[in-house]
Amino acid sequence: MPFRLPKKCRSYFSDITGRDETLLDTLFDGYYLCALIGLAQGKLNTNADLEASEFLDYYPADYAESGDYIAGLLIAAEAKRKAIPVDDANALEKLMTQLVESQSRTRLSVEGENLLNQYADRGIDVILERMTGRHTSLEAFFQDYFECWNSGIFLE
């Protein structure tokens, strides 16, 4: 399963995504910002409300070098969520082989892509619940987004 956009992302980010330099370049930027929240919380939506069609099956150019980093964040979040001790090398190796596929364009297995989609869905729910509302400027969005990180609101 390639990346699939949580349904709420498209409408939430529609006013701050586009070709203008004052906007997010792609919807993947919004997807990634949502996924970071879910990953940091170590929480996902198992019944994620995702768009039916594929969003992407690769990383956009700006993220091309970040695939290993994103895979690492996913592995760390899943290890924490599954309570795998950091000194349990066998369990961590098994988890990595379940989530990573080196030949995949995303460097993630189908299971890994599905989990990242679920973390992103959790992230958009948190944004909608805890930020001050839908933003019409990227600057206002980032101010609110980073304030939520700095104050720990996203991690509650």
Task: Describe the residue ranges of each PLM region.
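Domain-scale detector for complete catalytic domains at protein termini or as standalone homologs
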Residues: 1, 95, 155-156
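Surface-exposed, Lys/Arg-rich phosphate-binding patches that contact polyanionic backbones
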Residues: 2-29, 49-62, 76-78
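Short, basic amphipathic alpha-helical segments that act as recognition/interaction helices
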Residues: 25-49
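Short runs of predominantly hydrophobic/aromatic residues within well-ordered alpha helices
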Residues: 27-30, 35, 66-70, 92-96, ...
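Long, intrinsically disordered, low-complexity Ser/Thr/Pro-rich regulatory/activation regions
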Residues: 56-91
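Amphipathic protein-protein interaction modules
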Residues: 78-132
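Glycine-rich, aromatic-bearing surface loops/beta-hairpins
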Residues: 114-156
